[in-house]
Amino acid sequence: MGYKCIFSFKGQLPEMTKRIEFLGGIKVSTGTINCSLYLERVPDGSNLIPREFHLLLYDEKPKKCFTVCRDTIVETDREMVSILEKTNSYKKRQTTEALISKYELGDFIIRVGPIVFRTEIRGILVEVEYTACSTPVTSPFNCTKLLSEFINGNLGPFPEPIQTSFDFSAYPTLPKSYSDLHTSYQYVNLFRTIN
């Protein structure tokens, strides 16, 4: 797995897909990314503050889901969804979904599509993965400058430069090498700002 940068912008989807295809990007698949906010059920009249977490589902990982809660991110089996429904201790409050198209372009994989919240499009999601960072010699976290140049130089213009490095220190249990857990952190932070 390479290093990923995930962001949204308020432009038009056809413009972005034309840029990707002009650069030589080949559309290889479509899918969805689903992020649901769950709140703990507390008794009526209780002074307890309900705990919350986000649950992420990726079509590309049909057997896995990712849970983001406070300072912890966990990869679990997809059965977690049915367990939540059966136990009835948490209630799904809202869901944000991205309907993505996946493009391959040399050492890059680009996923792009509308972000939908309550039937309203809230922006365009862009995920850019630099796959050459997955080699053991290169730390994925050292690829941020190249990723920034690729995004801002080829996919823009954007009103502000796109941030490609992220502070993962709030999640001390994350592995040292970039993983799907880091990607889930980026998605939850993005979807929080959209809702």
From Swiss-Prot:
UniProt keywords, alphabetically: Activator, Nucleus, Transcription, Transcription regulation
Gene Ontology molecular function: transcription coactivator activity
InterPro entries per UniProt: Mediator_Med20 (IPR013921)
Subcellular location: Nucleus
Cited Pfam families: Med20 (PF08612)
GO CC list: mediator complex
Signal sequence coordinates: none
GO term, biological process aspect, one: transcription by RNA polymerase II
Family: Belongs to the Mediator complex subunit 20 family.
Assembly, per entry: Component of the Mediator complex.
Function according to Swiss-Prot or TrEMBL: Component of the Mediator complex, a coactivator involved in the regulated transcription of nearly all RNA polymerase II-dependent genes. Mediator functions as a bridge to convey information from gene-specific regulatory proteins to the basal RNA polymerase II transcription machinery. Mediator is recruited to promoters by direct interactions with regulatory proteins and serves as a scaffold for the assembly of a functional preinitiation complex with RNA polymerase II and the general transcription factors.
PANTHER family the UniProt entry points to: MEDIATOR OF RNA POLYMERASE II TRANSCRIPTION SUBUNIT 20, UBIQUITIN SPECIFIC PROTEASE HOMOLOG 49
Record-given protein name: Putative mediator of RNA polymerase II transcription subunit 20
Annotated source species: Dictyostelium discoideum
